[in-house]
Design a protein with these regions (language model features):
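N-terminal Rossmann-like dinucleotide-binding module
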Residues: 1-60
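C-terminal helix-rich "cap/oligomerization" subdomain common to oxidoreductases
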Residues: 4, 29, 36, 80-82, ...
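Active-site loop of classical SDR/Rossmann-like NAD(P)-dependent oxidoreductases
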Residues: 15, 45-48, 252, 323-336
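A short helix->loop->beta-strand "cap" motif at the edges of active sites that frequently abuts
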Residues: 62-63, 98-100, 125-127, 234-238
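Short acidic low-complexity segments
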Residues: 63-75
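Beta-strand-loop-alpha-helix segment that lines the small-molecule cofactor/substrate pocket
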Residues: 79-80, 86-136, 151
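Predominantly a Rossmann-like dinucleotide-binding segment in NAD(P)-dependent oxidoreductases
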Residues: 135-219, 373
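Contiguous beta-strand/loop segments that form the cofactor/metal-binding neighborhood of enzyme cores
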Residues: 188, 194-286, 333-347, 364-365, ...
């Protein structure tokens, strides 16, 4: 086997430990080589003194530990940098300037203009630049994408993509009145669902946004949003709605409600991978059932013609073939499998930085629409 790609990770907190390392470590083509963590290493005799989410020297004693960006980006052995810090733009730029390939957590950066600049730099340097939109590898979205691409639903006319989250604890810290680019739920959970919409349907002709603060404070920083994407040409009859609500008293949250000329798909409940990764102790991503959904939350597929005889029966009243359609397994490991292939030149990167940039632009236009009270043309 070829020499593994040496990975350097910027940051050592929740994101690194729960969303990246569990899916990097099982990949034999990736080797965790170094960390940039500003905190000093704890005394080996007192590893419990490590800060917050721990310290890389305790968990990865064989990896290099750098405390300054200058040292980290000067390591010529690092091929791939994974940026997991709250702020991204500076580290992405420094990684590209140092000749590294880059994976950056979502949201890509705070503005589409900054994204354009980094995309141009990556092209200039001839390096892979991709954004961690792992939700493309959710069980529910993989299933929806399969149904759409296979034609099971016919021509899609209405698609609602949700990422609802009842009373999330983290929004309690959003107390400032004024909005700054990159803040709010649309730039948080919304970047995932907007990315899913772009993956399925491409860029819209126009965007309309409705932003709300439902956490009990007077703030322009949204915790609830609805983004409506309208299309043109052959897709002029398509309406796509992307939503997040925090007031949502449901046992299982609505994920997808998609209707087309050939059928519909309604899905409640979420992909189990995140919950299993962040549990203590977490379930290893290598477990065969790591991405398997509970059949109780499989989505309901209704089609005008029989699509899957094993899961559908004919409903005499409606004339539709209806049944619980088995969800494909979630596969977050697929994200880093694709990254390794792209770095080695065997494949195109799945999550293109240009698509992530378009997602930022959708959110920018949604906010402009909300402020101005009108629909904004794509630009």
């Amino acid at each position: 086997m070829a020499t593994p790609i040496k990975v350097g990770i910027v940051g050592y907190g929740f994101s690194t430990k729960c969303f990246h390392l569990p899916f990097i470590l099982p990949n034999p083509e990736l080797h965790v080589h170094a960390f940039l963590q500003r905190a000093p290493a704890p005394d080996p005799a007192s590893p419990s003194d490590a800060p917050g989410w721990g310290h890389c020297t305790v968990d990865f004693p064989g990896a290099k530990h750098y405390r300054t960006p200058e040292e980290f980006f000067s390591d010529g052995e690092i091929e791939l940098v994974v940026v997991c810090t709250p702020s991204h733009e500076e580290f992405v730029e420094r990684a590209l300037e140092a000749g590294k390939h880059v994976v950056v957590e979502k949201p890509f950066v705070n503005t589409s203009a900054a994204a354009d600049r980094l995309i141009a730099l990556a092209k200039e340097k001839g390096k892979v630049l991709t954004v961690f939109h792992n939700r493309r590898f959710d069980s529910d979205f993989r299933t929806l994408e399969h149904l759409v691409n296979s034609g099971a639903l016919g021509d899609i006319r209405d698609a609602q993509l949700h990422f609802d989250f009842p009373s999330p604890s983290w929004v309690s810290g959003w107390t400032r009145k004024e909005y700054q680019p990159g803040e709010g739920m649309a730039f948080g959970l919304g970047t995932h669902t907007v990315d899913q919409a772009l993956r399925l349907f491409g860029t819209p002709a126009s965007v309309t946004g409705f932003l709300r603060s439902n956490r009990g404070v007077d703030s322009d920083v949204d915790d609830t949003f609805t983004i409506v994407m309208q299309y043109a040409g052959e897709k002029r009859n398509l309406l796509v709605t992307v939503k997040t609500a925090i007031v949502t008293p449901l046992q299982d949250q609505l994920k997808f409600f998609v209707r087309g000329t050939g059928g519909s798909y309604v899905k409640f409940g979420s992909c189990p991978q995140e919950a299993r990764a962040i549990a203590s102790p977490g379930q290893p991503a290598t477990d065969p059932d790591f991405g398997a959904e509970d059949p109780r939350i499989w989505g309901t597929l209704s089609t005008t013609g029989e699509f899957d005889a094993a899961s559908q029966t004919l409903d005499a009243a409606s004339g539709l073939h209806v049944g619980k359609y088995p969800s494909l397994p979630g596969w977050y490991r697929g994200y880093y499998e694709n990254v390794a292939d792209a770095v080695r030149g065997r494949a195109e990167v799945c999550v293109r930085a240009e698509t992530a940039r378009d997602g930022l632009r959708v959110i920018e236009l949604a906010r402009e629409s909300h402020v101005r009270g009108c629909t904004m043309p794509w630009s």
